[in-house]
Design a protein with these regions (language model features):
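Non-heme Fe(II)/2-oxoglutarate
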Residues: 1-43, 206-224
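Proline-centered turn/helix-capping motifs that create local helix->coil transitions or kinks
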Residues: 1, 47-49, 89-94
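Residue-level signal for well-ordered alpha-helical segments
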Residues: 13, 17, 35, 46, ...
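Catalytic core of Fe(II)/2-oxoglutarate
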Residues: 54-77, 84-223
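Sparse, context-dependent recognition of short Cys/His-centered cofactor- or disulfide-binding micro-motifs
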Residues: 12-16, 21, 25, 41-46, ...
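Active-site-proximal binding-pocket segments
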Residues: 27, 31, 36-42, 46-53, ...
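Short, functional N-terminal and low-complexity linear motifs
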Residues: 2-9, 48-49, 106, 120-122
Length: 224
């Protein structure tokens, strides 16, 4: 995947460069507005969204690009979004790949192996969902078309930050605990979800020598 830096950095451009990107800045500012955040809150019931912390970048998926299954739980993310912008003159075809795939949970905080919903790409389509530890599992299907560009603007709206009105440390602590216990990243580092490591018993192991194993007397004699 090819990705730009955070579009918040557009504020640092000079006048000439900013004029070249007026449409992009207008779109970014509209999505960062109080009105748009308020609409997302009403639709999702996600609770307060930060006016300070937001992430947004342009992503270009080409041939072979994909995204593995994960739940997007990183930092204080509350809502994930994707605005699809493939070439409108040549509508994106499902057989080109790149579809957005959503997964059910087959057991507690473990995603199923197969998606339950596949969302094809369309110009100007806006997808969004509430980030939930151990639940908001999704992936991006591999792009298989040799030349087409799956262009999009994507990012995250975040929970309230400590210096914003309405911030609750108690609520934040609950969020952090849920992330630690149930997120896909947390599961990778949690001993709770790890199988115990059992070393091979070299005395009964009948296969090839394991890395780090002592050489047998027979092998030492051969090398001598």
């Amino acid at each position: 995947m090819n990705q730009t830096g955070d579009l918040a950095n557009l504020d640092g451009l000079g006048e000439e460069e900013a004029n070249r990107l007026k449409s992009l800045m207008k779109l970014r500012n509209a999505m960062y507005s109080d009105e748009f955040r308020g609409w997302l809150r009403r639709v999702t019931g996600c609770g307060p969204l930060s006016a300070k912390k937001k992430d947004m970048s342009i992503n270009d998926y080409r041939h072979g690009c994909h995204l593995l299954n994960h739940d997007d739980v990183i930092s204080t993310r509350r809502i994930s979004f994707i605005l699809y912008l493939p070439d409108p003159a040549e509508p994106w075809q499902p057989e080109w790949g790149g579809s957005f795939e959503m997964y059910p949970v087959k057991e507690k905080h473990v995603p199923d192996d197969l998606p339950s919903n596949i969302v094809p790409i369309k110009w100007n389509q806006f997808n969004f969902f509430v980030v939930q530890p151990g639940h908001s599992f999704h992936s991006v299907e591999e792009v298989v078309h040799p030349t087409q560009s799956r262009l999009s603007i994507s990012g995250w709206f975040h929970r309230l930050q400590p210096d914003e009105p309405g911030f609750s440390q108690e609520e934040e602590d609950r969020e952090l605990q849920a992330e630690k216990e149930f997120s896909s990243v947390g599961s990778l580092i949690s001993k709770k979800f790890m199988d115990a490591f059992v070393e091979y018993d070299e005395a009964t192991y009948g296969g090839p020598s394991l890395p780090g194993s002592r050489m047998s007397t027979e092998h030492l004699k051969f090398l001598a």
